[in-house]
């Protein structure tokens, strides 16, 4: 069975943790930006379903 030979240092652990947290922060910022653009109606980079109930009620 494979086992690590030595304990990972706190510095290496913190470095990996910081990388993970940084990637999560970038993803969260991007999601927030996309959400804001959808709410303001300025989203042009993707297609999302519109509410069809309002069109049916108008007819």
UniProtKB/Swiss-Prot annotation:
Keyword list, A-Z: Ribonucleoprotein, Ribosomal protein
Identification of the protein by name: Large ribosomal subunit protein bL32
Entry's family note: Belongs to the bacterial ribosomal protein bL32 family.
Composition-biased stretches (Basic residues): 1-20
Cellular compartments per GO CC: large ribosomal subunit
InterPro entries: Ribosomal_bL32, Ribosomal_bL32_plant/cyanobact, Ribosomal_zn-bd
GO terms under biological process: translation
KW Ribonucleoprotein (keyword) present: yes
Organism (species): Prochlorococcus marinus (strain NATL2A)
Annotated spans, Disordered: 1-22
Top-rank taxon: Bacteria
GO molecular function, one term: structural constituent of ribosome
């Amino acid at each position: 069975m494979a086992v690590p030979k030595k304990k990972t240092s706190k510095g290496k652990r913190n470095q990996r943790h910081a990388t993970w947290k940084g990637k999560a922060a970038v993803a969260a910022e991007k999601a927030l930006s996309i959400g804001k653009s959808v709410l303001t109606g300025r989203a042009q980079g993707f297609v999302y379903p519109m509410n069809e109930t309002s069109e049916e009620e108008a007819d």
